[in-house]
Amino acid sequence: MPPQLHNGLDFSAKVIQGSLDSLPQAVRKFVEGNAQLCQPEYIHICDGSEEEYGQLLAHMQEEGVIRKLKKYDNCWLALTDPRDVARIESKTVIITQEQRDTVPIPKTGLSQLGRWMSEEDFEKAFNARFPGCMKGRTMYVIPFSMGPLGSPLAKIGIELTDSPYVVASMRIMTRMGISVLEALGDGEFIKCLHSVGCPLPLKKPLVNNWACNPELTLIAHLPDRREIISFGSGYGGNSLLGKKCFALRIASRLAKEEGWLAEHMLILGITNPEGKKKYLAAAFPSACGKTNLAMMNPSLPGWKVECVGDDIAWMKFDAQGNLRAINPENGFFGVAPGTSVKTNPNAIKTIQKNTIFTNVAETSDGGVYWEGIDEPLAPGVTITSWKNKEWRPQDAEPCAHPNSRFCTPASQCPIIDPAWESPEGVPIEGIIFGGRRPEGVPLVYEALSWQHGVFVGAAMRSEATAAAEHKGKIIMHDPFAMRPFFGYNFGKYLAHWLSMAHRPAAKLPKIFHVNWFRKDKDGKFLWPGFGENSRVLEWMFGRIEGEDSAKLTPIGYIPKENALNLKGLGGVNVEELFGISKEFWEKEVEEIDRYLEDQVNTDLPYEIERELRALKQRISQM
């Protein structure tokens, strides 16, 4: 392992804000050890103040890292090096003594459920990257809380970074600053170390003034040491270490040890016309509409949806047996393309101020632009693409990167739930799994039991563009929408979910599966989606209340005739939308069987195997 971070205080960095003396002892040791290793010129201990934020933005503007968007209030645009635009699964690793602690050993080929790296290989990689990596730069010390400060479900981290973009983004995405250090005291924290990997003076010029080191990028998680170590990328998912690295990969491992769940799920509150409210959590793969569902304007009169979170849920059963959930984040880091007044009016309202945009296009009047924004341009207004080139609608290339983002405070969302920062969390009564399935999978079905529901999560598949070929679409396995984010062996993760059924007094939520994306033979969507999805939530609400509105099918319960409220909705072919074809499902079950047998292999819990066999049996009798 890399030398335990470190003793001896031979570093010359000058502390330009805050004081090392004021830090809790363990934090101070962490800062000093890494200052000695990375050799920054300055150390800045972040206080999280408005003033500090303003100074960071001004500094980045001066350096040409961001520019001000004059059309909005305190909004900024960053354009990255085109080689640093997304999470990189091939360079994201988990280090444990045994490979099997991280991933099941697959029958053939490589695991698709995570990447393990040995301690020896990591030590070499670490020592080839970090010594001196912050020369000439400032090391920022970011104390942050995932979850409302003081919540029993919250966890604290300290991130050291040489990127002011990371500091500014972390101030939006987490609770950050002095109050966190006060709450931490001598408590435990997750150690996060991040460097863009560009010591000064530069060896080669930056692209777009964006510091990164793509050749040496590595994002490493050391769950046994409660550490995250990231090098070479400034992009959100790789550098905002509170997000996927901590809130999913490290937290899922903590959750297994401590008896809770850390999941890639939105959390929403839905209130019926009588004023009765329920909370639901939903797991969809990235870019399948989590943010749109979490911020939905229901088309059904009298129904109301409110947003607790759009991406991550930390959930734990309380003493009364209610599954309580918090959103560990403080902001939304949303995909911009496709966001419009039609698809997500509440997101559009949220991002009008105090927002950092990354890799979207800019209009000549100081606004933002992207594919699917659906906004008419004023006469004479031109567009500059994310590659900083003039762009015209007829151009073949998109104006915004497909993974371009907005980073915006959750508190600005017009429909943020009144309990979104409740320290004890909100009670979850339904869990929804879903993906993008053009054929075969009905609009909604309900699992037969908790065990069957866990199987449904394990069997999740979703259409993804085959990035390698740029040809057709392929259906990818994405169990629990967690495939890129598991912090430990997926077989053990399934066993952990199954174990929730044995908690004393646990009120297990109902589990549902949805598919907004089924198409007819001409390739047209069978369901209008967006605000109309409230009709599906209404049916779930009734089911949770014990309504007799479902009929049994081989794959689960679907709405009875006329149980789904389609009032005012013309032209929906219900038969096609809910059709369950024996031929399709025989193939589907074979595919799931092959995947679980190959990928989870001997770590597959018996209960999941039993659910698979039972489903096979039911389909064969259709």
From Swiss-Prot:
Extra information: In eukaryotes there are two isozymes: a cytoplasmic one and a mitochondrial one.
Modification after translation is described as: Acetylated. Lysine acetylation by p300/EP300 is increased on high glucose conditions and promotes ubiquitination by UBR5, acetylation is enhanced in the presence of BAG6. Deacetylated by SIRT2. Deacetylated by SIRT1.
Role description: Cytosolic phosphoenolpyruvate carboxykinase that catalyzes the reversible decarboxylation and phosphorylation of oxaloacetate (OAA) and acts as the rate-limiting enzyme in gluconeogenesis. Regulates cataplerosis and anaplerosis, the processes that control the levels of metabolic intermediates in the citric acid cycle. At low glucose levels, it catalyzes the cataplerotic conversion of oxaloacetate to phosphoenolpyruvate (PEP), the rate-limiting step in the metabolic pathway that produces glucose from lactate and other precursors derived from the citric acid cycle.
Cystine residue pairs: none
Q: Residues that bind substrate, according to the entry?
A: R87, Y235, G236, G237, S286, N403, S404, R405
Q: Which residues carry this modification: Phosphoserine?
A: S19, S90, S118, S286
Record-annotated residues binding Mn(2+)? Answer: K244, H264, D311
Record protein name field: Phosphoenolpyruvate carboxykinase, cytosolic [GTP]
- State what induces this protein: Expression is repressed by ATF3. Expression is regulated by glucocortinoids and insulin. Up-regulated in CD8(+) memory T-cells.
Species: Mus musculus (Mouse)
**Gene3D superfamilies referenced in this protein's UniProt entry, alphabetically:** 3.90.228.20, Phosphoenolpyruvate Carboxykinase, domain 1, Phosphoenolpyruvate Carboxykinase, domain 2
InterPro entries named in the record = PEP_carboxykin_GTP_CS, PEP_carboxykinase_C, PEP_carboxykinase_GTP, PEP_carboxykinase_GTP_C, PEP_carboxykinase_GTP_N, PEP_carboxykinase_N
Describe activity control: Phosphoenolpyruvate carboxykinase activity is regulated by acetylation and glucose levels. The anaplerotic conversion of phosphoenolpyruvate to oxaloacetate is improved by PCK1 acetylation on Lys-91 (K91ac), Lys-473 (K473ac) and Lys-521 (K521ac). High glucose concentrations favor PCK1 anaplerotic activity by triggering acetylation on Lys-91 (K91ac). At low glucose levels, SIRT1-mediated deacetylation of Lys-91 promotes the cataplerotic conversion of oxaloacetate to phosphoenolpyruvate.
